[in-house]
From Swiss-Prot:
InterPro entries linked to this entry: Ferredoxin-dep_bilin_Rdtase, Phycoerythrobilin_Fdx_Rdtase
Protein name: Phycoerythrobilin:ferredoxin oxidoreductase
Gene that specifies this protein: pebB
HAMAP family per record: PebB (MF_00793)
Database matches in PANTHER family: PHYTOCHROMOBILIN:FERREDOXIN OXIDOREDUCTASE, CHLOROPLASTIC
MF annotations from Gene Ontology: cobalt ion binding; phycoerythrobilin:ferredoxin oxidoreductase activity
Keyword entries, A-Z: Oxidoreductase
Amino acid sequence: MTNQRFKSTDPVNIEGWSWQPFLEDAIKRLEGLNVEPYPVPDRFLQREDQTGSKSKSIPVTTATWACKTEKFRQVRAACVSAGSAASVLNFVINPKSTYDLPFFGGDLVTLPAGHLLALDLQPAIKTDEVHTTHVWDRLIPIFERWRDQLPYGGPIPEEAQPFFSPGFLWTRLPLGEEGDELIQSIVRPAFNDYLDLYLELAASAERVTDERSEVLLQGQRKYTDYRAEKDPARGMLTRFHGSEWTEAYIHTVLFDL
């Protein structure tokens, strides 16, 4: 059973959704930041459909949790539950361009072939040392702590490399008991370590000049434009909810800068 939701900060409770503990961990860490609901149109707060065959349909729920704070333009969680077909949490923090911060990205995906899991503090301008050095100096030790405890997920496309840091933690895990154990014992604490570092960086961040803010904004737009164009969830969401809804969701909610 799912709950009816009226604003973007209303709780997401989807029966059987495997990533619920991760979302709850993240929301708890945002307490104390004076979060406000982020404007999300009603039709994207929660949608329910069916997938699969006529003889064996699978219920699908896609929900959006989102907020904004003093330093974060948008914090949002795209939550998808489709039984054995898919289970997804895409959790992203988009900072305001008035602060020299990266993006936080957590992508937790379960498909019939296995789990695809990625964590990063993604740079808006990877070649800008002022933007990256203070982040990477603290991120790399956390990355190294967890990297050797997880299988490597494989190389990322060259065109995507400007949007990932050297601390990009990326793995593929099998379905079943082995993968579930690694998710609980390694991936969940790694997710929280990455998020804790991000929130520490944000807490100490000070406003930048208008000129610097404009430079950061251009970098952020390149990132969001790329993500909107290449969103790997597009095919899945289109299959579940149709093309019109999916394109509107990608461009007006997920990557709306």
